[in-house]
């Protein structure tokens, strides 16, 4: 399973660890992904999504129905 948010599309980015001596080594910054079940009232079932915490806030604000329709319009499987 890839580390990509199904709502926002956030994915890992690369950067550097920087030591006290200013030595730099490559690292990855991973998104804060959570697997969460959401109840979809009009389908009378739970939908399991892998979303970032920002994606959860978006679902709280606009609603799960709107988010699911956007995911399906992009061709995502839900």
Swiss-Prot record:
The keyword Ribosomal protein applies. Keywords: Ribonucleoprotein, Ribosomal protein. SUPFAM superfamilies: L28p-like. Residues 8-21 have a biased composition (Polar residues). Residues 1-21 are annotated as: Disordered. The keyword Ribonucleoprotein applies. It holds the Pfam family Ribosomal_L28. One of its GO terms (cellular component) is cytosolic large ribosomal subunit. One of its GO terms (molecular function) is structural constituent of ribosome. One of its GO terms (biological process) is translation. InterPro entries: Ribosomal_bL28, Ribosomal_bL28/bL31-like_sf, Ribosomal_bL28_bact-type, Ribosomal_bL28_sf. HAMAP family: Ribosomal_bL28. Belongs to the bacterial ribosomal protein bL28 family. This is Large ribosomal subunit protein bL28. It comes from Hahella chejuensis (strain KCTC 2396). The gene is rpmB.
């Amino acid at each position: 399973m890839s580390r990509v948010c199904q709502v926002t599309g956030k994915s890992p980015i690369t950067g550097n660890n920087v030591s006290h001596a200013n030595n730099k080594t490559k690292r990855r910054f991973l998104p804060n992904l959570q697997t969460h079940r959401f109840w979809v009232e009009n389908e009378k079932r739970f939908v399991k999504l892998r979303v970032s915490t920002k994606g959860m806030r978006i679902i709280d604000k606009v609603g799960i129905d709107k988010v699911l329709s956007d995911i399906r319009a992009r061709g995502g499987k839900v």
